[in-house]
């Protein structure tokens, strides 16, 4: 029995040592690369309680007191030109303010399953975005996720009590 206990202790220690955290240096490189290229919206820094992360807020043409938090896919950023930028800008034509946020990311060679340990970082980021929007007076808040952002949004909703009014993923 003592042998099993020792093995479990060693395994628990090994898993703890291998736990990954978001690649904050890569996040900063993305932020530096895109900050001056934003044509629609304003960049901002949000804080998840441990670190600052990039957000891009874009006001709707018509002020309808509703906002969408947009979450990108694996390894990219909150202004990804192929999907996220058209979504965050296009929704403003339909009365939605958008806040596209930097989700936790890993190095370029990381595969999809390697992201699982980062899911603990998801709730603080989404909560920071929700809190910002509430402080700005938005009452109706929805989450929209693409690819890994969809999975992270699903994980968030399954594990957190929230008053967001919708989810598209």
Language-model segments: residues:
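Gly/Ala-rich beta-loop-alpha elbow adjacent to hydrolase catalytic centers
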Residues: 144-153
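Bacterial N-terminal signal peptides
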Residues: 7-16
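Alpha/beta-hydrolase active-site loop
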Residues: 112-136
């Amino acid at each position: 029995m003592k042998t099993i206990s020792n093995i479990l202790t060693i395994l628990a220690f090994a898993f703890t040592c291998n736990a990954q955290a978001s690649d904050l240096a890569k996040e900063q490189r993305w932020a530096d690369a895109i900050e001056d290229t934003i044509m629609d919206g304003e960049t901002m820094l949000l804080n998840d309680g441990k670190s600052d992360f990039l957000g891009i807020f874009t006001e709707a043409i018509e002020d309808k007191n509703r906002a969408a938090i947009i979450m990108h896919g694996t390894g990219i950023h909150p202004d990804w030109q192929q999907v996220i930028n058209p979504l965050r800008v296009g929704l403003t034509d339909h009365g939605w303010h958008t806040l596209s946020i930097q989700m936790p990311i890993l190095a370029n060679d990381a595969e999809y399953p390697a992201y699982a340990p980062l899911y603990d970082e998801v709730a603080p980021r989404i909560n920071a975005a929700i809190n910002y929007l509430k402080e700005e007076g938005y009452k109706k808040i929805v989450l929209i996720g693409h690819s890994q952002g969809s999975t992270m949004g699903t994980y968030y909703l399954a594990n957190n009590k929230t008053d967001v009014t919708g989810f598209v993923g």
